[in-house]
Amino acid sequence: MKNNFSFTAVLLLIITGFVSCRTNTESILPPSSVVSQIDIPRVTGMPDMPRPYVMKDWKKTAVDFDHYVYDFSQKGPFLPLIWIDTMKRNFLQNTYGIYTAIGDVREGPHVNDGENHEAIGALGSIIGATLVGIDKSEQDGNNYVAMVKNYFNKDNGWNIIMNFTGKKAHIGGGYGNDYWYDIYNNVLFYGVSHFYPNVEGIDSVQRAIADQFLASAHKLGSNYSYSFFDFSTMTPGKNHIPTQEDVAAGYAFVLYAAYIKYKDDKYLKGAEMALKALEAQKENRNYELFMPFGAYLAARLNAEAGGNYDVMKFLNWTFEGKSVNRDGWGIIVGNWGGYDVSGIYGSTKDKGGYGFAMNTFDLAWPLLPMVRYDQRYARSIGKWLLNAANASRLFYPYDIPDSLQALPGKKAITKNVIAYEGLVKEPDLKGHTGKSPFAQGDGPLWAPGMPDETMFSVYGSGHVGIFGGTIRTTDVEGILMLDCLATDMYRKENAFPTYLLYNPHKDKKSVTVPLGSSSVDLYDAVSQKFISKNLTGNSSVEIAPNQAVLLIFVPAKSKLSAENNQLKANGTIIDFNYKINK
């Protein structure tokens, strides 16, 4: 009896040891084939290393923007840039407004009872500030997160976030008549709510939005070919504004986030229905900002929900500049007047090219986390963002020569944290033709009496924290360390720190990566292998020329497992595309 027991015990120890060794970092089976990088065609036309190269301190810019714009004590012409709205629309509380542009005569505390202010500026600035470490729920005695609930239009029966608190305040920009404004502000609100889920009343607003979006999605089915949707009557409509089929990606984002938050499959089904409607389009319907969210949701649903969406289709529609409902809308590629401007987002045709600050900042929100779920696009996204981040400094009046901007003599009021609305190749402003690139804005055209200073875009500049919270420089010029988790909102599961680094140089580079004080094993999801182990402090990582790495900081000595095409460390997914032939 004793001999049999001893034999059994030894056998169990051997088996246990075998299983253990199969799950440690030394012996996990390699993938049957390593994923290959896929080039986004539009990105291949961009320089590997943009010139002249000057990387703006995006985090400092975002912090300084918040300190300037959210300062009620600022004095001088057109200041302060913020005020309190005491009209208590939709909720019995005060809210606040920030100017759309410096000096906007349509807005302010003494115009229309202080009600004229846009959600797109307030919500974007909260997300941006939060990404660089500022708590907007408790700042100088104000809870700005709670205050933006007033944009939830329940008084008119729509029960979604809208660009204004009510029809009385509609001064331009969309309000019930321009689809992207109504949908994107809900994407932004869900972004705010991701960071502040416990602020009073936020959850109930989120749930109401999700239910309205789901009802609307069922009403629309596979047809989003409308200019707007009346959420009070659940009726779509058309007007002089082009149809905007890409809003379906905005629906998908909100509904998938609601699915993760509330764990109710009806929202997942709604998200899938919306994304399939967009994927089924026969031509590029990229209108404003939703198509990159389509790429992000496609990658996530493929990785997390067994989908089979065409990620490249959404990426091409985002980048190629061949939209049919907004002619030429996409990513600009080129060198204007000796400046590489590739990567900025806007019209590839208007004025020879017109890239916008807000759109460019916001593009990083979905595209960076997308590579977590589909690392085949790591190199392309790294290259695009290097170009975009370099070119975007030219939106700022102190980062572009005076001769290449509309208002060099009036730039002091910007403190170089408020950018021009955009950058054009061929300006048509009197006295400035032939200058390229040229920083300007459309503010003076919005209404009679607008001062020149309305070229400086407060609403767009508030989104700069998306760059500030995701981009950091390294000890090698041109190699950025890009945070792929910062804007990966409503994650289904826990995740380890994940960074994308792209080497734009023609030779191999060794870059220093800060790891922190806890021991980690470095996994590269591009090569699909561990490249260093048991590290703390700083580590040197080699990157081949014109290649990228996607680094995951895995706790040292984690137990590994590979199943269902996923590689996990201590149960946390570190690779969504790890395929092993068994």
Model-derived regions: residue spans:
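Extended ligand-binding clefts on enzyme/binding-domain cores
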Residues: F213-D230, Q281-F293, L297-L445
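Low-complexity, Ser/Thr/Pro/Gly-enriched N-terminal "stalk/linker" regions
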Residues: T23-A169, N198-S227
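Carbohydrate-binding surface patches
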Residues: P444-S517
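Solvent-exposed loop and edge beta-strand segments that line ligand/cofactor-binding
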Residues: Q93-A122, F164-Y184, T233-V247, L278-M291, ...
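C-terminal beta-strand-rich structural cap/linker in extracellular carbohydrate-active enzymes
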Residues: L535-N581
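Well-ordered alpha-helical scaffold segments within catalytic/enzyme domains
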Residues: G45, G121-E138, I183-G201, N239-P242, ...
